[in-house]
Amino acid sequence: MAMQKIFAREILDSRGNPTVEVDLHTAKGRFRAAVPSGASTGIYEALELRDGDKGRYLGKGVLKAVENINNTLGPALLQKKLSVVDQEKVDKFMIELDGTENKSKFGANAILGVSLAVCKAGAAEKGVPLYRHIADLAGNPDLILPVPAFNVINGGSHAGNKLAMQEFMILPVGASSFKEAMRIGAEVYHHLKGVIKAKYGKDATNVGDEGGFAPNILENNEALELLKTAIQAAGYPDKVVIGMDVAASEFYRNGKYDLDFKSPDDPARHITGEKLGELYKSFIKNYPVVSIEDPFDQDDWATWTSFLSGVNIQIVGDDLTVTNPKRIAQAVEKKACNCLLLKVNQIGSVTESIQACKLAQSNGWGVMVSHRSGETEDTFIADLVVGLCTGQIKTGAPCRSERLAKYNQLMRIEEALGDKAIFAGRKFRNPKAK
């Protein structure tokens, strides 16, 4: 079924920054998609086109990307008369029309907006739910509900506190369903709020960009201690484990790491990658930490490799791999990590996201689907994670509607699947394992 009309507009994301929204019309109706954007971005990501006009939205407008869709991409696609079910052909056409390595001509935010809308229209054209259409595109007969990784304590570039490491997450792996995982996560979150309030005062329970708390603590193990206390207070020490996103590229300074990077610079306090690795090993030993994302800088390959060989937990590449097949292949070859963080806007199309996921999975890696810190009410990634069977998703705390939109959609999907619903649970790293 051909596209009848493609129209893009500028809307605002959850941080009050402009982003791209696309309406695509077919005979089946209107299909709308919105593009997210990140705060801590890897230098190898596809280009998010911003206007740079300082007098408007402080330079962050996206009118150029919107115009690229309305004046060029849209008309070219309509003229080409491609079917919305041919996701790969549509994406390939847009990528070739752009012609750059990092989508800098039209902007990854323009191409992705159209790509997401096409995927939604394709599902409707086939008369199947979006998650089933995505599973078909990926060649997956199965559908798997993911373990949610709730980012409940925020630091790094996401928060105004002194904490260097960006995210401290809880994963209810011992739940028997996604719905139960949501309940456990929410209960631990509320207990955590009480623990933080009692220890640091009420103003310490204000939330960050992703709905997590941002108490003014400096020591990273203090955040882990708070999680441990909240998990026990909620009564789930056997069901909830901990994940971290360090985002270490944000505090990498001249070959060393500055764990107090939000204070005036003191090179005497910077530590080596090896020392930082020892700190992580102490976390793994003393707390139920099962996953660490971006433990080192995106170009500090040697430290990644030596660290991975000495631990048996999940080590996730985000800034390291940026959902890019070339970077993933490099990380596989160097044995730098064992899990891919999948962000659709890092690579800029649905087809390439699916390819990146399959490349990681074919090399024995886990895959975690992820939101960005600047989100919208769009729920595409909820269907994506079920269709790709990755078994794990991180899309913030159980707080703030742009985060809950995804989690609530996952609960609806589980309900729709009924007794066919499979929850990844403790097999979140390799949910397809029998």
Curated annotation (Swiss-Prot):
Cofactor(s), by name: Mg(2+)
Listed InterPro entries: Enolase, Enolase-like_C_sf, Enolase-like_N, Enolase_C, Enolase_CS, Enolase_N
Example of a GO cellular component annotation carried by this entry: cytosol
UniProt catalytic activity: (2R)-2-phosphoglycerate = phosphoenolpyruvate + H2O
Binding site for Mg(2+): 245, 293, 318
NCBIfam families noted in UniProt: eno
Positions contributing to substrate binding: 158, 167, 293, 318, 370-373, 394
Sites of Phosphotyrosine modification: 236
Sequence positions bearing N-acetylalanine: 2
Disease tied to this entry: Glycogen storage disease 13: A metabolic disorder that results in exercise-induced myalgias, generalized muscle weakness and fatigability. It is characterized by increased serum creatine kinase and decreased enolase 3 activity. Dramatically reduced protein levels with focal sarcoplasmic accumulation of glycogen-beta particles are detected on ultrastructural analysis.
Active site per UniProt: 210, 343
Single Gene Ontology MF annotation: magnesium ion binding
Cofactor note: Mg(2+) is required for catalysis and for stabilizing the dimer.
SUPFAM superfamilies from the UniProt entry: Enolase C-terminal domain-like, Enolase N-terminal domain-like
Assigned EC number: 4.2.1.11
Family stated for the protein in its record: Belongs to the enolase family.
Subunit field text: Mammalian enolase is composed of 3 isozyme subunits, alpha, beta and gamma, which can form homodimers or heterodimers which are cell-type and development-specific. Interacts with PNKD.
Gene it is expressed from: ENO3
Pathway(s) of this molecule: Carbohydrate degradation; glycolysis; pyruvate from D-glyceraldehyde 3-phosphate: step 4/5
Positions carrying Phosphothreonine: 72, 205, 229
HAMAP family in alphabetical order: Enolase
GO biological process, one term: glycolytic process
Subcellular location: Cytoplasm
Phosphoserine PTM sites in chain numbering: 83, 157, 176, 263
Protein name (Swiss-Prot/TrEMBL): Beta-enolase
Keywords on record: Acetylation, Cytoplasm, Disease variant, Glycogen storage disease, Glycolysis, Lyase, Magnesium, Metal-binding, Phosphoprotein
Function, as annotated: Glycolytic enzyme that catalyzes the conversion of 2-phosphoglycerate to phosphoenolpyruvate. Appears to have a function in striated muscle development and regeneration.
